[in-house]
Amino acid sequence: MLDIKFIRSNPDVVRRAIELKGEKADLDRLLLLDEKRREMLVELEALKNKRNTESDNIARLKREGKDASELIAKMKELSDKIKDMEQELREIEEEMEKILWTIPNIPHESVPIGESDEDNVEVRRWGEPRKFDFEPKPHWEIGEALGILDFEAASRVTGSRFVFYKGLGARLERALINFMLDLHIEKHGYKEVFPPFLVHRRSMFGTGQLPKFEEDAFKVEGTDYFLIPTAEVPVTNLYRETIIDGEQLPIYHCAYSACFRQEAGAAGRDTRGLIRQHQFDKVELVKFTEPDKSYEELEKMTRDAEEVLQALGLPYRVVAICTGDLGFTASKKYDIEVWMPSYGRYVEISSCSNCEDFQARRANIRYRPKGGGKLQYVHTLNGSGVAVGRTFAAILENYQQEDGSVVVPEVLRPYMKVDVIRKEE
């Protein structure tokens, strides 16, 4: 959420951000309400001062034994007017708040201008896509043939866009989770948390999922609980309504969680395989930083996520996301896209975002600067480190052999206890 003072002072900047991100927000109405609110506050203050004066006059007349009935009647009229104005002010503030919720974060000046993912800008690549001497198969065919992925059983048990990982498939999923966590904890300095998979509405609001993306969330009927779409939600809200000692910053957290998404806008896209599931595993990275360090920390976070793919030997590219594809909460975002041979293209496997103080204002996360001074909002960052199911898919496709087996990446062998995944007899 943006500061109303910033919006008031920079309406053209905010209007441009709304336009660049393709959002709909009634900025003119907000500014009109803000002006009216400030005028009413001045008037209310004057009326309350007048009420205090009249109250003193009534008390004086009573002490002197004089008739105060006329002043008491005026006092009642004044109090009623104040009460009515306070109610109107509350209604104005509620309407302002609802409009504020619809205003997106301001894109950083370094973000490419564009309307869609076609305007995103490639920053760098790592690794060379493998040249196959046979026709590479898609990961779902490989997994089903090996008996390690079962989409048909999941469809019977739950529905479409779910999967059973079986045998060495379950072990590979678990190995990837543990490998990613170990890398981020032991090498990159993140502290692990294991969060709840259910959060309440205020937490979803704090990270910006609500109210805009409610249709994509799974809500538990009859409760205020939502299944988390990403561990970003509980981990960021770990510090909601708190004041952090500036000496503790930056704070790095990593977390494994299952993630749950309706994928409401994804009809017809990636309908087969692991790329777009209603439930999927992910290792998330979350940072809390001082404002002047957040962009440096974004670069480091992106490199941390990249290192997962480098260690696994998976070719990828990093893309700077343009304004129209940036999303509601981010000021700047990088996507990491892994090479998928059967697709013949790179597929998103991680997004790393700097939200500046946008989420911190919504969740009221502040810090006390080193050496004292006025409380400030932290900057929050989040990134996938990385999506586990998509990494599973990328390994099957990039490490597949002509006989249908899959070579296990070397760094995973201590976790897997096998070098090659073959069909179990």
Curated annotation (Swiss-Prot):
GO terms, molecular function: ATP binding; catalytic activity, acting on a protein; serine-tRNA ligase activity; transferase activity
Matching SUPFAM superfamilies: Class II aaRS and biotin synthetases, tRNA-binding arm
Annotated pathway: Aminoacyl-tRNA biosynthesis; selenocysteinyl-tRNA(Sec) biosynthesis; L-seryl-tRNA(Sec) from L-serine and tRNA(Sec): step 1/1
A GO CC term attached to the entry: cytoplasm
Record field: catalytic activity: tRNA(Ser) + L-serine + ATP = L-seryl-tRNA(Ser) + AMP + diphosphate + H(+); tRNA(Sec) + L-serine + ATP = L-seryl-tRNA(Sec) + AMP + diphosphate + H(+)
Keyword Cytoplasm among UniProt keywords: yes
Residues engaged in binding L-serine: T230, A231, E232, E284, S384
Residues holding ATP: R261, Q262, E263, E348, I349, S350, S351
Subcellular location: Cytoplasm
Keyword Aminoacyl-tRNA synthetase part of the UniProt annotation: yes
Keywords, ordered alphabetically: Aminoacyl-tRNA synthetase, ATP-binding, Cytoplasm, Ligase, Nucleotide-binding, Protein biosynthesis
GO biological process: selenocysteine biosynthetic process; seryl-tRNA aminoacylation
Major location (coarse): cytoplasm
Broad enzyme group: ligase
Catalytic activity, EC: 6.1.1.11
Record comment regarding domains: Consists of two distinct domains, a catalytic core and a N-terminal extension that is involved in tRNA binding.
Similarity comment: Belongs to the class-II aminoacyl-tRNA synthetase family. Type-1 seryl-tRNA synthetase subfamily.
NCBIfam families from the UniProt entry: serS (TIGR00414)
Subunit annotation: Homodimer. The tRNA molecule binds across the dimer.
Its biological purpose: Catalyzes the attachment of serine to tRNA(Ser). Is also able to aminoacylate tRNA(Sec) with serine, to form the misacylated tRNA L-seryl-tRNA(Sec), which will be further converted into selenocysteinyl-tRNA(Sec).
HAMAP family: Ser_tRNA_synth_type1
Protein name: Serine--tRNA ligase
Organism name: Caldanaerobacter subterraneus subsp. tengcongensis (strain DSM 15242 / JCM 11007 / NBRC 100824 / MB4)
Source lineage: Bacteria, Bacillati, Bacillota, Clostridia, Thermoanaerobacterales
